[in-house]
A protein has these predicted regions:
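Beta-sandwich/jelly-roll carbohydrate-recognition scaffolds of carbohydrate-active enzymes
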Residues: 5-204
Length: 204
């Protein structure tokens, strides 16, 4: 199968031939499906491929192999959804980058099955007239099973732009409304590193 809807399965060339899946058009209705198809993992951590910006139709998920929890006696035992740290809010001249507003001129998201890296390339024009190009990369490390890394590059066109980025750790993630963890401690180290410690509610 070479393509299905807005997905293509034959985008790789040369040594990457038949290794690359591409989503060529953004669709809010298909977010959950693409998050599952593009999911990344290393045998210890597994993550759904939710985008950096938040959408109402998404399902964010980070899971740890072998970790199970039951919220109460009447609930089923399940893989608890861990804290999310991939949400990045980006503002250009005070307008937030979201593909459901403004104009998305170009969109491509790819998963290379050979190295496990997800890349996303977006050309976007805000309602305030700002035009910019975005490059996103994310991978789950095999070398260090505790590492998930992401990189964002922003290239405004034509003029100087004030860029504001807001990121953090959301420890209030749920499994369809069931929150398995409660916050124990959250703090910043030298304004460069955020530490978040949580504890399970739980009954195994």
């Amino acid at each position: 199968m070479e393509s299905s809807g807005n997905l293509s399965y034959n985008k790789g060339v040369k040594s990457d031939k038949n290794w690359v899946i591409e989503e060529s058009r953004f669709s809010r209705r298909e977010l959950k499906k693409i998050e599952a198809i593009f999911a990344q993992g290393n045998g210890y951590l597994g993550q759904r491929a939710a985008l950096e910006e938040v959408y109402s139709t998404e399902t964010r998920g980070l899971y740890l192999a072998g970790l199970y929890d039951r919220f109460g006696e009447e609930e089923v035992t399940e893989l608890p959804n861990l804290a999310d740290f991939c949400n990045i809010r980006i503002f250009l001249d005070d307008e937030e980058f979201r593909m459901v507003q403004g104009k998305t001129v170009l969109y491509s998201r790819r998963l290379n099955l050979k190295d496990g890296v997800i890349t996303r390339h977006v050309c976007w024009e805000g309602r305030n007239g700002v035009e910019a190009e975005f490059f996103f990369e994310r991978f789950v490390s095999l070398a260090d099973k505790h590492v998930i890394a992401s990189r964002v590059r922003i290239m405004p066109y034509h003029r100087n732009v004030k860029v504001k980025i807001i990121s953090g750790i959301n420890g209030r993630m749920t499994n369809n409304g069931t929150q398995h963890f409660h916050e124990v401690e959250a703090r910043m180290h030298k304004e460069k590193m955020m530490e978040y410690i949580s504890d399970a509610q739980a009954k195994q």
